[in-house]
Amino acid sequence: MASTQVLAGFHAVVARLRHAPESIKEIYVEASRRDKRMQTFLEQAERAGRRVHPVAAERLDGLARGTRHQGVVAVAEERSLAVGIDEVLDVIEGPALLLILDGVTDPHNLGACLRTADAAGVHAVIAPRDRAVGLNATVQRVACGAADTVPYLTVTNLARTMRELKERDVWLVGTDDQAGESMHQVDARRSMAWVMGAEGEGMRRLTRETCDQLVRIPMLGSVESLNVSVASAVCLYESVRQRQG
């Protein structure tokens, strides 16, 4: 029997209804909500042939386990987009764009990174298995559906995976506040991966040493660094800018 996961909030549940409705086993909604947004959602669920159970808000709180649910919770089969690195690269047409997260364990940060990755056309997000958060309900909610569209690969040895990417001609660019080069000096039109460390800690030594290039994000004000999800967005959209220019 496939293991299940809880999806909380309109964005997460609607995204699953759109991409894999058959994976949803049950949907629970707050019985007292009769607003337009809820009505639209109920119509979507009906079109997808999914059963909906009106329940008390307290029941939803218990199912969501602390995740803000907006009156909507679904129980669904776990849906993994995780495949091997080679499988990801083999089907890409044109230059690859990857995001590597080293030590990002906060679910809000991961969810925001996945959402940005989807918007920027990232082919996969990669993280070390022992230093990463799983695709829990909070990640699913913050990602606004991107957890169902962007492959999230957790690997046992990040440095080894990075070396495998280099063998496939993927240029690895790490962000470092002390780097001499600016992110704007990166040739982001080639197959590449942006490598991000955890906020406060940065990349681990071996991760940093495995990068082909280290760059800094220009900081013109008084703050010294950006949140990892914001830094990821800045760098990924530099790739988008160059590739569309």
UniProtKB/Swiss-Prot annotation:
It catalyses: guanosine(2251) in 23S rRNA + S-adenosyl-L-methionine = 2'-O-methylguanosine(2251) in 23S rRNA + S-adenosyl-L-homocysteine + H(+). S-adenosyl-L-methionine binds at G197, I217, L226. Disulfide bonds: none annotated. Its main location: cytoplasm. CDD domains: SpoU-like_RlmB. It is found in: Cytoplasm. The keyword Methyltransferase applies. The keyword rRNA processing applies. GO terms for molecular function: RNA binding; rRNA (guanosine-2'-O-)-methyltransferase activity. It is an enzyme of class 2 (transferase). Keywords: Cytoplasm, Methyltransferase, rRNA processing, S-adenosyl-L-methionine, Transferase. This is 23S rRNA (guanosine-2'-O-)-methyltransferase RlmB. The gene is rlmB.
